[in-house]
Amino acid sequence: MQSLTIPRPDDWHLHLRDGAMLQTTVPATAAVFHRAVVMPNLVPPVTTVAAAMEYRERILAEIPAGMSFNPLMALYLTADTTPAEIAEAAANEHVIGFKLYPSGATTNSAAGVKSVEALAPVLAAMQEHQVPLLVHGEVTDSDIDIFDRERVFIERHLIPITERFPQLKLVLEHITTADAVKFVENANSNVAATMTPQHLLMNRNDLLVGGIRPHNYCLPILKRRSHQQALQQAALSGNPKFFLGTDSAPHVQANKETACGCAGCYSAPAAIELYAEFFSQHNALDKLANFASVFGADFYQLPRNTETIELVQQPWTVAETVDTATGPMVPYWAGSDLQWKLRG
């Protein structure tokens, strides 16, 4: 049986939700990943260091005995965020950065920013204190096609931000387009990007052909195949600017299979195996370790993990559903096979 040992990976973009859902989401991620950047789009959003530390305690309470897991908290950037709050966040080792959500771009983003330009004083403070800006890169104008939202955001906002604040550490999250790949490649070393399993393994045909497939629906939405290929090439290139961020986003089945279904793929139960599937498909399993375990830690200037995990080539089928305290959840890739499995 073939096997692959890599340093324990980190998930640089994760949604755990709150309350009883943590009983399901925290163990699923802690079983594999040493660290995860936890997104702040709760209701109400996590906008202060104090709120983030309270949320972190709720997460820590759900880590199973014998597991080590370090949640790194992202704060929700709003029009009311102050430079003083940036300084407070910079002094807290458990805060990784601030998340920029354009208002209305994704789940629970109503409190998001309506004017990126108005953030200049806060971005200056983030640059000064070297606090990373984590970006959901989509405009939300009603006249912009949903498949163009990322490209327009880059042109309208990200290029000006990086030109004005060249020392600001910036992560363009869950990239989906060739435009995003080009932007990150052309930017300086302070700019990086996370990539999800679904955007590497699928394109919009997998969402829309043969019926609407709600469990493949996420935001930013899956794009055409040429964009998928650009993402794949970037992940396979070994460029350290591109690294793992699942954007695993749990929603109960009833909220996905409905007339107005929620956006998000719950990939945590098979996360590292999904990435292994992608790299294996491209005969590039040797690239998995850096993508999953090295590049993100290096970008955030955090120590690389010394523990290891082992994957074995052993076909298995992802469960059709995952039980939670608030109802069944359909994981990403449900009922489909993967070729690699985490040992243990």
Curated annotation (Swiss-Prot):
The modification N6-carboxylysine is found at residue 99. The active site is at 247. Zn(2+) 1 binds at residues 13, 15, 99, 247. Gene3D superfamilies: Metal-dependent hydrolases. One of its GO terms (biological process) is 'de novo' pyrimidine nucleobase biosynthetic process. It catalyses: (S)-dihydroorotate + H2O = N-carbamoyl-L-aspartate + H(+). It is an enzyme of class 3 (hydrolase). Zn(2+) 2 binds at residues 99, 136, 174. Its cofactor is Zn(2+). Binds 2 Zn(2+) ions per subunit. CDD domains: DHOase. InterPro entries: Amidohydro-rel, DHOdimr, Dihydroorotase_CS, Metal_Hydrolase. Pathway: Pyrimidine metabolism; UMP biosynthesis via de novo pathway; (S)-dihydroorotate from bicarbonate: step 3/3. Homodimer. Belongs to the metallo-dependent hydrolases superfamily. DHOase family. Class II DHOase subfamily. Catalyzes the reversible cyclization of carbamoyl aspartate to dihydroorotate. This is Dihydroorotase. The gene is pyrC.
